[in-house]
Amino acid sequence: MNPIVSGASVIAAGLAIGLASIGPGIGQGTAAAQAVEGLARQPEAEGKIRGTLLLSLAFMESLTIYGLVVALCLLFANPFAG
């Protein structure tokens, strides 16, 4: 394997997982803060808020998992390694 392609793949894998985790991390923090605020205002809506929060957190976390899959593909099943 070309050392330049190998080095670029490692850097790209690091960027893929790093950048893929920034957005969902911020989003999860914001969603959790808003859920706690909603629970403080309306404690009787706890079940509905919790269910919606868990579903939205799962969707946000899936974006990070996609970044991990891209990083693993770049490291172990590199399409650019001729």
Curated annotation (Swiss-Prot):
Belongs to the ATPase C chain family. F-type ATPases have 2 components, F(1) - the catalytic core - and F(0) - the membrane proton channel. F(1) has five subunits: alpha(3), beta(3), gamma(1), delta(1), epsilon(1). F(0) has four main subunits: a(1), b(1), b'(1) and c(10-14). The alpha and beta chains form an alternating ring which encloses part of the gamma chain. F(1) is attached to F(0) by a central stalk formed by the gamma and epsilon chains, while a peripheral stalk is formed by the delta, b and b' chains. InterPro entries: ATP_synth_csu_bac/chlpt, ATP_synth_F0_csu, ATP_synth_F0_csu_DDCD_BS, ATP_synth_F0_csu_sf, ATPase_proteolipid_c-like_dom, F/V-ATP_Csub_sf. The lineage of its organism: Eukaryota, Haptista, Haptophyta, Prymnesiophyceae, Isochrysidales. It comes from Emiliania huxleyi. Its main location: plastid. It is a multi-pass membrane protein. Keywords: ATP synthesis, CF(0), Chloroplast, Hydrogen ion transport, Ion transport, Lipid-binding, Membrane, Plastid, Thylakoid, Transmembrane, Transmembrane helix, Transport. GO terms for cellular component: chloroplast thylakoid membrane; proton-transporting ATP synthase complex; proton-transporting two-sector ATPase complex, proton-transporting domain. It is found in: Plastid, Chloroplast thylakoid membrane. This is ATP synthase subunit c, chloroplastic.
